[in-house]
Amino acid sequence: MQNSEGGADSPASVALRPSAAAPPVPASPQRVLVQAASSNPKGAQMQPISLPRVQQVPQQVQPVQHVYPAQVQYVEGGDAVYTNGAIRTAYTYNPEPQMYAPSSTASYFEAPGGAQVTVAASSPPAVPSHSMVGITMDVGGSPIVSSAGAYLIHGGMDSTRHSLAHTSRSSPATLEMAIENLQKSEGITSHKSGLLNSHLQWLLDNYETAEGVSLPRSSLYNHYLRHCQEHKLDPVNAASFGKLIRSVFMGLRTRRLGTRGNSKYHYYGIRLKPDSPLNRLQEDTQYMAMRQQPMHQKPRYRPAQKTDSLGDSGSHSGLHSTPEQTMAVQSQHHQQYIDVSHVFPEFPAPDLGSFLLQDGVTLHDVKALQLVYRRHCEATVDVVMNLQFHYIEKLWLSFWNSKASSSDGPTSLPASDEDPEGAVLPKDKLISLCQCDPILRWMRSCDHILYQALVEILIPDVLRPVPSTLTQAIRNFAKSLEGWLTNAMSDFPQQVIQTKVGVVSAFAQTLRRYTSLNHLAQAARAVLQNTSQINQMLSDLNRVDFANVQEQASWVCQCEESVVQRLEQDFKLTLQQQSSLDQWASWLDSVVTQVLKQHAGSPSFPKAARQFLLKWSFYSSMVIRDLTLRSAASFGSFHLIRLLYDEYMFYLVEHRVAEATGETPIAVMGEFNDLASLSLTLLDKDDMGDEQRGSEAGPDARSLGEPLVKRERSDPNHSLQGI
């Protein structure tokens, strides 16, 4: 190599341009890397440099082994080289991968602030002109990309990737580098650097890069808003927050995932850290947990006869497993949200009384049915507790379609030592037993206990956030129950089928209601935690004319005005205190207790509870109507809160009635499940209660044919009727 005389002391370099005096350059594949000085004496000559190695010119500019502050340009040339300025140094370029000596301590790429990225085996296709946290590189070799939150180890030609979680806090240099790039690219002023530092550190503490994983964009922003609210920080808008994320996790992609009409934008390549406190909170879980497992580990359920055609190229073919294996993978993530310690209650004994058994049916058969049905229900509990919902159909088919011979019966159930003949019942014997009214009533009560236990296992707390995958699995399970049971009992008498399906229908309806309530709770939680929305709701609520609402609703509901005023004041006070969802739930529970305590122990308790629900719903609809007519800015928030509180009131009243009657909530809701078979005796009891209350009101009120409350508004000396 020869250096020019004039440019030896100049640190800068400029791109070379051909001069008029330069001879033509012959066509040659030879490549020369030239670095020129910016200031050279006139007349300085450039010596031609011949390179022994001939390289093919790639279409994309490749980085060299070192990065210099000056510009670098590739010049095609042979023996003659452009003489525009004095040439300082010329370097050969070799595009093939080069191995660096382990003893070398020089880094390949040095970024401002002390951050460092080390690449082994080969160079990436391009080096960005700016340095941020988490640079993603992907080549045919095996580069190791070091970032603040994780180490991504890229493989070779098969492009397989694995992530190693790195949970240590980011260094100050890393954060300074990200802030510096944000200031350059977005024009962020320096006085906001402290605020950005808090935001970026929170991102690095709670999230990490991971291949094959995505999170809803809205969930990340909701987590960020919660963080700002807890630490009294001013949040940035959603667009600026997206730039914050991309400044921390380079190479992050955006995908639109979900079903048609219900899709949402997701960040692909990021997930919550396992030790992040957001895993326990999950205040906004509408879609958050859907992508917490890598996508290639969740193959879609397909029929068993098509499993041979499943598979993928390479090592991924073994990941397409059976539905049982898929459920096992999902259940590992969902076990923490269900009550696996639930104790299955004992069944009562059938009350035969003086009932005469049919020919061919003995007490021994009844005892065998008790044992078999108990084991069948225990197996159902085990399957649901393991979240293997698809096994329920097989269990029902096996139990209700046992063969005519005992040897062909449900042999999967072990025989009891107390039953020497084995705890099996042939199908014809089972049909005969179910046709006995005491046996059918006993089986119905057992089903109430069973399905109530399943509800408490799957949804132990209706307000606790659960992953949307678990919620959707429960709803799909509820949707299939009636069809599965009807198909399994197709050969049984219609009365038996109606009795069994009526209970399972109440169970399915309860699952749908509770999952909907849980969904509303998570949506309302974000509203109740938003200070500005709460203030707007309180301002709009103070404009509502509650005197007019009471005037219109009193004729229908006949409620005490003092009770309505107290509820109004308590509601405003709870809203003003910015209470959490759990505090609101406690307040609603106290309202139910206060209203229904006067009916405790009375046969009219269920009727009073239902009337309270109707009155609560009517009053709330009147308030919503007033907000609508006033074009309240917080109408959407009030509508969401109203839906949640109505549904939660239903849940509370349902359990209070079950407690008062000694039944399970499933039994209470199953009472009116079939509108075609409403209990006329229950309706008669309600009518009798109305007549008794009418007689207590006096002959004047009955003669006017007008509710008591409407008349008494003109008589302040008369006490108003209670709820």
From Swiss-Prot:
It comes from the Eukaryota. Keywords: Cilium biogenesis/degradation, Cytoplasm, Differentiation, DNA-binding, Nucleus, Phosphoprotein, Spermatogenesis, Transcription, Transcription regulation. One of its GO terms (cellular component) is nucleus. One of its GO terms (molecular function) is DNA-binding transcription activator activity, RNA polymerase II-specific. Transmembrane segments: none annotated. Residues 1-46, 292-332, 688-723 are annotated as: Disordered. The keyword RNA-binding does not apply. SUPFAM superfamilies: Winged helix' DNA-binding domain. Residues 322-332 have a biased composition (Polar residues). It is found in: Nucleus; Cytoplasm. Changing A37G: In a breast cancer sample; somatic mutation. GO terms for biological process: acrosome assembly; cellular response to leukemia inhibitory factor; cilium assembly; regulation of transcription by RNA polymerase II; spermatid development. Its main location: nucleus. The modification Phosphoserine is found at S28, S416. Homodimer; probably only forms homodimers in testis. Heterodimer; heterodimerizes with RFX1 and RFX3. PANTHER family: DNA-BINDING PROTEIN RFX2, RFX TRANSCRIPTION FACTOR FAMILY. Transcription factor that acts as a key regulator of spermatogenesis. Acts by regulating expression of genes required for the haploid phase during spermiogenesis, such as genes required for cilium assembly and function. Recognizes and binds the X-box, a regulatory motif with DNA sequence 5'-GTNRCC(0-3N)RGYAAC-3' present on promoters. Probably activates transcription of the testis-specific histone gene H1-6. Belongs to the RFX family. This is DNA-binding protein RFX2. The lineage of its organism: Eukaryota, Metazoa, Chordata, Craniata, Vertebrata.
